[in-house]
């Protein structure tokens, strides 16, 4: 299996399966001298880990990360950073009844046809369990970006049919949904409780924002910053769509509304989401991602077995009724990995470039 490494200068390689002994990652390209300890990584892992509320999977994983290499006396050395998270709460017997069946809308069928063999226990390599390593690696990127004045944060902007207007960052970490409107939390909880009673699942929309990004990141033509972000975010399990800035809403906009006019005091809008011509503009970079409802539900669904016979599939085990609830830290991590990669690439080629034009802020 190829495709396990992401990035060009700052790279992340992951390995491991949902019900294997452990997950591992190798992070290459982190600049030396960055102060880094376990808590820097564990903080974001705790935000993503399962079993933290009744609205997520009840699989109990501590997700305690170990740093195996690349850090000495509390600072990165420039060497590869090895990371490990041990799996401790696998219940593989939950999947024995479907080992010869294909769960509809899962990777079972496509993995079977591509590789001729698949780990049916919790989805194996296709499980979102793998994203724990991305969050750990992304925490390293976030730590370095913070030294450059770049802050990356995310929140849930829609759960099923419930639109969630942004009110304040202050409430995002105070609830299980990463909801920026505290008044919406009771409605979200009631919706999820009913969803569980219905033995069903639902999708979600996540918004992730990077502030403090300098102008100039991005490599046209084929490594545009928005294209790389879309690539990274689409690589998150269950993501079916990505928007940058106004996204698909730009179809209904006129040029007079969509263009981000400039004055000596700053930009008058940010419909472009902080990226123009594939290059960061210095405005906040804003991306939205849509996650599908998982098909791992106990309501029977029609499918086939490995011999092509018709079958009804009921997925037992412990699953998230809305995978978007835990997706915010993953989206933050992938944006951080992309931005650090492009920061290092920009530094390598364009570090000596300077212009007299002032950097505009957002009015």
From Swiss-Prot:
InterPro entries: Chorismate_synth, Chorismate_synth_AroC_sf, Chorismate_synthase_CS. Its EC number is 4.2.3.5. GO terms for molecular function: chorismate synthase activity; FMN binding. FMN binds at residues 125-127, 237-238, 277, 292-296, 318. One of its GO terms (biological process) is amino acid biosynthetic process. Pfam families: Chorismate_synt. Keywords: Amino-acid biosynthesis, Aromatic amino acid biosynthesis, FAD, Flavoprotein, FMN, Lyase, NADP. Pathway: Metabolic intermediate biosynthesis; chorismate biosynthesis; chorismate from D-erythrose 4-phosphate and phosphoenolpyruvate: step 7/7. It catalyses: 5-O-(1-carboxyvinyl)-3-phosphoshikimate = chorismate + phosphate. Reduced FMN (FMNH(2)). Disulfide bonds: none annotated. Its cofactor is FMNH2. GO terms for cellular component: cytosol. NADP(+) binds at residues 48, 54. This reaction introduces a second double bond into the aromatic ring system. Belongs to the chorismate synthase family. Homotetramer. This is Chorismate synthase. It comes from Pseudomonas savastanoi pv. phaseolicola (strain 1448A / Race 6) (Pseudomonas syringae pv. phaseolicola (strain 1448A / Race 6)). The gene is aroC.
């Amino acid at each position: 299996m190829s495709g396990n490494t992401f990035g060009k200068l700052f790279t992340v390689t992951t390995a491991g399966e949902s019900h294997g002994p452990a997950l591992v990652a190798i992070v290459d390209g982190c600049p030396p001298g960055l102060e880094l300890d376990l808590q820097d990584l564990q903080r974001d892992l705790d935000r993503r880990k399962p079993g933290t509320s009744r609205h997520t999977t009840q699989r109990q994983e501590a997700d305690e990360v170990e740093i195996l290499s690349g850090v000495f006396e509390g600072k990165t050395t420039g060497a590869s950073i090895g990371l490990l998270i041990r799996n401790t709460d696998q219940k593989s017997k939950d999947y024995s009844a479907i080992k010869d069946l294909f769960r509809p809308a899962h990777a079972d069928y496509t993995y079977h046809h591509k590789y001729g063999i698949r780990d049916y226990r919790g989805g194996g390599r296709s499980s979102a369990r793998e994203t724990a390593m991305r969050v750990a690696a992304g925490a390293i990127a976030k730590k370095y970006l913070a030294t450059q004045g770049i802050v990356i944060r995310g929140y849930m902007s829609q759960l099923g049919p419930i639109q969630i207007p942004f009110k304040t960052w202050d409430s995002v970490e105070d609830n299980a949904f990463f909801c920026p409107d505290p008044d919406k939390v009771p409605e979200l909880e009631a919706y999820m409780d009913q969803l569980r009673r219905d033995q069903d699942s639902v999708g979600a929309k996540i918004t992730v924002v990077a502030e403090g990004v300098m102008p100039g990141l991005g490599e046209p033509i084929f490594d545009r910053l928005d294209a790389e972000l879309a690539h990274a975010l689409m690589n998150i399990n269950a993501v079916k769509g990505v928007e940058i800035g106004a996204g698909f809403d730009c179809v209904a906009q006129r040029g007079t509304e969509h263009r981000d006019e400039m004055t000596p005091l700053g930009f008058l809008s940010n419909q472009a989401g902080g990226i123009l011509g594939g290059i960061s503009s210095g405005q906040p970079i804003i991306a939205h991602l849509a996650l599908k409802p998982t098909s791992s539900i106990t309501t029977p669904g029609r499918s086939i077995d490995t011999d092509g016979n018709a079958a009804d599939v009921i997925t037992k085990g412990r699953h998230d009724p809305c995978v978007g609830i835990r997706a915010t830290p993953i989206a933050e991590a992938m944006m951080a990995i992309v931005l650090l990669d492009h920061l290092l690439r920009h530094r390598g080629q364009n570090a000596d470039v300077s212009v007299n034009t002032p950097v505009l802020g957002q009015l």
